[in-house]
Structures are given as structure tokens and as C-alpha cells.
């Protein structure tokens, strides 16, 4: 356990951020799974893409990881539409 006041505050902030990040990452994964399962639901695809962009912008996931998932979702959506 930290003894210094600033270290205690840093630990509090770190724990709060971890909880927040866990919730956002869970919502992101859920949206991506819904988009994969949905055959022709454009709304699910757009929601997943929006969440991926936001997560990459905030540093929750790497921007290349977001681009990779978006690319695979688009490829799958195009294949199911054709």
C-alpha cells in the first residue's frame, strides 16, 4: 500500500480508471459480437464501428486494432449482403 499522499491518490485514480475501462471494453466486445451475429443489421454494424473509433481515440485499444476489427466486420457484412 502506498504511504505517500500523492501515491494514494494515484492508486484511487488508477482503480477508478480500471473499472471504467473494464466496463467500456465489455460494451465494446458486446457490440462487436452483436455486429458479427447480425446478418443484415446495419445499425449493429454502425454501433460497433462507432464504439471502436471512440475506444481507439481514448486509448482504450490501439488504433490499428480498431482498424483491424472494423475491416473484418466490413468484410463480413459485405459477404453476408452478397
From Swiss-Prot:
Coiled coil: none annotated. Residues 16-29 have a biased composition (Low complexity). The lineage of its organism: Bacteria, Pseudomonadati, Gemmatimonadota, Gemmatimonadia, Gemmatimonadales. GO terms for molecular function: small ribosomal subunit rRNA binding; structural constituent of ribosome. Binds directly to 16S ribosomal RNA. It holds the Pfam family Ribosomal_S20p. Keywords: Ribonucleoprotein, Ribosomal protein, RNA-binding, rRNA-binding. Residues 1-29 are annotated as: Disordered. This is Small ribosomal subunit protein bS20. One of its GO terms (cellular component) is small ribosomal subunit. The keyword Ribosomal protein applies. Belongs to the bacterial ribosomal protein bS20 family. GO terms for biological process: translation.
Amino acid at each position: 500500500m502506498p504511504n505517500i499522499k500523492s501515491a494514494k491518490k494515484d492508486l484511487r485514480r488508477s482503480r477508478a480508471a480500471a473499472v471504467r475501462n473494464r466496463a467500456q471494453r465489455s460494451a465494446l466486445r458486446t457490440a462487436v459480437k452483436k455486429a458479427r451475429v447480425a446478418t443484415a443489421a446495419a445499425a449493429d454494424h454502425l454501433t460497433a464501428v462507432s464504439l471502436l473509433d471512440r475506444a481507439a481515440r481514448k486509448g482504450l485499444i490501439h488504433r490499428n486494432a480498431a482498424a483491424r476489427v472494423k475491416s473484418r466486420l466490413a468484410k463480413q457484412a459485405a459477404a453476408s449482403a452478397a
